[in-house]
Amino acid sequence: ATFKILISPTPVIGPDRPTKKDNHSNKGFFYEGENIRKFISSQPNMYVICGDRHWQYVSKHRKYGIVEFSIGPNSMEHAGGWKQDNVKPEHLYLNVVGGVMTVTIDPKDSPKIIVSHYDVDGNELNKFVATAK
């Protein structure tokens, strides 16, 4: 496959809140997370999609260059858990909102992956596009 996507119930890249200890993006499972990140970084055109975050984001790991997408909640009622102005260096996109996310693979010419975040009304908020290496 040109593109490979790991779908994880929790973040592998993050960032996550400092008090959290239950996923691969923080100190609680650092060893396991580091092994996963090393493997992912050895795979060309591999991305991570995670759930269980109550905000939308796209982040890029500073050491490994891995890009992770967080879908966020389906409703505004469940959006929260992160401050909108708490943008970290690894964030390429951050929005504490509900909505949906789509992933499209365009195989024509130079293959591309297109990941778009939408709000609860279907308005596109962010679009990430990358060409296969």
Where are the language model's segments positioned?
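Long, structured stretches of catalytic cores involved in phosphate-ester chemistry, encompassing
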Residues: 1-133
